[in-house]
Amino acid sequence: MYFVYMIKNDFEKLYVGITENPKARLYYHNSKMGAEFTKGKAKFRIVFLEEQGSLAEARKREIQIKKWRRDKKEKLVGLYNKGISTKIDKSS
């Protein structure tokens, strides 16, 4: 099982990625062992998490979300945090 996730820090920086273990991945981001983008940029928290059935599906969704403008990403985060299914809009 794979997850597409978004993390955000206190400076409102958003990062999109995929992982099999969201808790461990967040630890790596916050301990400066994660992606270059997140190193030394304050503590991140998970603001979006979406389960995918396979690595291929997760990668496809990650790429899709990364192409979106910030406002669309924030809308997705808002839906997730309201408990609304985020799998309703998979169009680019």
Describe the residue ranges of each PLM region.
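GIY-YIG nuclease catalytic motif and its immediate N-terminal context
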Residues: M1-A35, K39-D71, L76-S92
